[in-house]
Amino acid sequence: AKEKEVTFQ
């Protein structure tokens, strides 16, 4: 996810 500042754990 480099489009938004979202982090997936």
UniProtKB/Swiss-Prot annotation:
Protein name in UniProt: Scolopendra 5887.74 Da toxin
Expressing tissues: Expressed by the venom gland.
Organism: Scolopendra angulata (Barbados giant red centipede)
GO cellular component annotations of the record: extracellular region
Keyword Secreted: yes
Main location: secreted
Extent of the signal sequence: none
GO molecular function annotations of the record: toxin activity
This protein's UniProt keywords: Neurotoxin, Secreted, Toxin
Compartment(s) of residence: Secreted
UniProt similarity note: Belongs to the scolopendra toxin 4 family.
